[in-house]
Amino acid sequence: MKKELLCILKKYETHPDFLGDTIEDVNQVGGMDDTVLHIAVRNNSLNDALVFLQNGALIDLKGDLGYTPLHYACMFGNIEMVKLLLDNGSDKNIQNEFGENAVSIAINSSSENKEKIVKLLNNFKKRK
């Protein structure tokens, strides 16, 4: 494993989802069914998320309640994170356990960026 990745993973071992665990894989699931990518997205840690993606993080892996990293980025209004995830192939149509996709999560969020995120999601065309 690359040194940069190891250093970042070490930091996430102190997160309550992974407390007491050694994280050996970017797709390792923590106590609440989330991965380090989910946590990085929730914390708006753009650099950490990028490193995880560059090292094989599964971008559309469902975590707690069926939320994907893109769902969290939309919920918390993190525009740059939404862009990063979409640019790296995240599927905006995946639904969580409540039947919500990224657009509906953005619409229902309390984020001041929700209109921009909805527009971004609606205008995004997946690369072929």
Locate predicted features.
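Ankyrin-repeat-protein effector appendages
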Residues: 1-14, 88, 107-128
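Conserved ankyrin/ankyrin-like repeat signature
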Residues: 47-48, 80-81, 113-117
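Ankyrin repeat A-helix N-terminal signature
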Residues: 8-13, 39-45, 72-78, 105-112
